Regions:
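Alpha-helical support elements that line or immediately flank enzyme active sites
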Residues: 386, 429-434
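Carboxylate/His-rich catalytic cores and anion/metal-binding grooves
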Residues: 193-195, 333, 377
Length: 629
């Protein structure tokens, strides 16, 4: 009868659900059942010698005992204390500590964007140092893993700043390559977060790396300046201040303190900014785009037109504004719901106006649109980096990266209307982040060496209700299971399977772009948002099970991953199966899984290559593989 078809095997695998119990056991059982149907005699008789060789293994290593004083960081200790206070206040008992292998897989995914190799896993778990977790974190944040670290974090921040679809369209002004190159250099240099924000908000220059005046930082804003820079204002507030203000361009927010005038006063900072672009005649693709600063005369008026006592006049051959007192001014206008037109000048979200700041220095042109008098984006950058909201939003976002949930939900809507789950901890972490010079690696280190991050994802008696997915405020009494991001999954598949080993660089890039593109859906709305659809649906299950990458990973070609494992004379059949589990899941198979593998090996008449292929396919398509846990 031959090898069971993937289509027939899928019949036993349709309950593909990321939150299901042991999908892996179900997958292995389906493979075993199919093999038994094809080879009933062998399944009944078995290969006793092979089954005995693949004897049962311990399901988990014993959790290590890491005393509280392993990490000397005062902030890590403070995290532990304040989170523990929350447990005590709610009468919650935390889960056990994660095993070394569990923690190792977790921290590799979060810091390096991929699972560890078998060699890396063994190196860590076999180390006897009581400081080995801190030592591994230092390695992941240091030169040894610089390539993985920068690839991971440039990807994360490219997606934050321009989305997963930003710069992928042929007619896009954004250069995705330029954005990623800029962020790669920034994370490689451990650029302070405030400096990063300042550069992103004030950048001028060409978007593409091959242009003369290239400045990759311009790609954050270059496609957000249409319609008067509405998206520039909204995304700046959302990403860097943790403020969701998009809807206030039309009206006061119905559920929080954000007001319509605040949105347009923030928007006024971007009115001196423009985009120069050139279009290729042949296919109407944009050849280049350049972000520039230019004088802003004021919005929507002609010479002699009066609104709110603001007039345009000729100065040095240009139309500029003077108010009734003769001071230069360049206003913008917005409309209330009742149709009344209002004027807006640059003012920060805390109410600080440029006119007031300049007046304190004896200057009267804070509302001017002339670059020779004021550069509004430069002034906005100063206000941003001076604002305590900057570090608060950054810490909240970083915490959510490592725990799956921030102190607020959503993470970019912070305020009195949306109280933080741990306000004291958020405030202290934010203060410390500023005090350490906005050192992002330091912030990461505090978090990943904390007690909450080291907990098991398995609920304990008494903390079953600590589940933010049910709408409850997180207590962080266990590690919350979450899906890998598509980029993490892709890199982890490559690490586990070496599926790209024989590809050229151009082929690797094409395969990655095509694979990741399956998960992205742009949402057509005025917020410029998109969705990364990776939810365990049947189409995605089919893509994983039958896609090119998994198919390539499961080949038994000479010199391939499975061929090397199957023909490794130094490994027993048991050790070969163990190797597959460690390569994908960073653990050994449990007793039930081992029994199924034994039965499958018997059903295959001891055909190790075919058995390994079936087991490998099931492991890669398991919910456990695609989860951070």
């Amino acid at each position: 009868m031959g090898v069971p078809s993937r289509g027939r095997l899928l019949l036993g695998l349709t309950p593909y659900c990321l939150a299901a119990g042991s999908f892996l056991l179900a997958a292995l059982a389906a493979v075993r059942a199919e093999a038994a149907e094809v080879l009933p005699a062998a399944a009944a008789a078995g290969d006793k010698q092979a089954a005995a060789e693949a004897g049962p293994q311990d399901e988990r290593q014993s959790p290590g005992d890491y005393p509280d004083d392993v990490d000397a960081s005062a902030m890590t200790a403070r995290i532990n204390d304040l989170v523990r206070e929350g447990w005590q206040a709610q009468g919650v008992r935390p889960s056990r500590q994660a095993t070394d292998a569990e923690w190792c897989r977790r921290v590799y995914l979060d810091l390096a964007g991929r699972i560890p190799t078998v060699a890396e896993l063994d190196s860590f778990t076999q180390r006897r140092s009581r400081l080995k977790r801190a030592e591994l974190v230092d390695s992941l944040l240091g030169e040894e893993y610089a390539a993985d670290y920068t690839r991971n974090w440039k990807t994360i921040w490219t997606n934050i700043l321009i989305g997963r679809t930003g710069g992928t369209d042929r007619q896009s002004l954004t250069s995705r390559e330029g954005m990623m190159d800029y962020l790669e250099a920034s994370f490689a240099a451990n650029k302070p977060y405030d400096a990063l924000v300042r550069e992103l908000v004030t950048a001028t220059g060409d978007a593409r790396p091959d242009m003369e005046n290239y400045n990759g930082a311009v790609n954050f804003l270059i496609e957000k300046l249409d319609e008067g820079g509405v998206q520039a204002a909204a995304k700046t507030a959302q990403i860097f201040l943790g403020m969701s203000v998009q809807c206030t361009q039309c009206h006061n927010h119905p559920f929080n303190e954000h007001r319509q005038n605040q949105f347009w006063e923030l928007n006024a900072f971007f009115r001196q900014t423009g985009v120069d672009r050139a279009m290729m005649d042949e296919d109407e693709d944009y050849d280049y785009a350049t972000l520039v600063d230019r004088d802003f005369a004021g919005e929507g008026k002609m010479a002699g037109d009066a609104r709110d006592s603001v007039f345009l006049e000729q100065v040095d051959g240009q139309l500029v504004d003077r108010d009734a007192a003769g001071v230069f001014s360049a206003p913008i206008f917005y409309e209330l719901r009742n149709g009344q037109v209002q004027v807006a000048f640059p003012a920060f979200v805390d109410g600080t106006t440029l006119a007031e700041r300049f007046a304190e220095q004896g200057a009267e042109f804070g509302n001017s649109g002339r670059l020779s008098q004021v550069n509004r984006r430069q002034e906005l950058a100063k206000l941003l980096v001076d604002s305590p909201s900057l570090e608060t939003a950054a810490v909240n976002r970083m915490w959510a990266h490592f725990f799956g949930y921030g102190f607020t939900k959503p993470i970019d809507d912070i305020g009195s209307h949306n109280p933080a789950s741990h306000p004291e901890l958020l405030a202290e972490l934010a203060k410390a982040f500023r005090a350490c010079g906005f050192d992002m690696r330091q912030l990461m280190r505090w978090i990943v060496l904390s007690d909450p991050y080291a907990l098991s994802s398995t609920a304990a008696e008494g903390n079953e209700d600590d589940d933010p997915a049910l709408g409850r405020a997180p207590l962080f009494s266990r590690f919350y299971v979450r899906q890998m991001q598509p980029e993490q999954l892709y890199e982890s598949l490559l690490v586990a399977t070496q599926a790209d080993a024989k590809l050229k660089e151009a082929e690797r890039d094409e395969m990655k772009t095509r694979w990741l593109g399956q998960f992205n859906t742009a949402l057509g709305n005025d917020e410029g948002t998109e969705s990364t659809v990776f939810n365990g649906s049947i189409p995605q299950a089919l893509m994983m099970m039958n896609g090119d990458l998994v198919e390539r990973a499961c080949r038994t070609d000479a010199g391939g991953f499975l061929d090397k494992v199957a023909n490794n004379a130094e490994l027993s059949n048991r050790e070969k199966i163990n190797y597959l589990y460690r390569a994908a899941l960073s653990r050994l198979p449990g007793k039930d899984e081992t029994n199924i593998c034994n039965e499958l090996l018997a059903a295959r008449y001891g055909d190790v290559v075919q058995t390994l292929q079936d087991v490998w396919w099931a492991v890669l398509n398991s919910n456990e593989f695609i989860l951070v846990h």
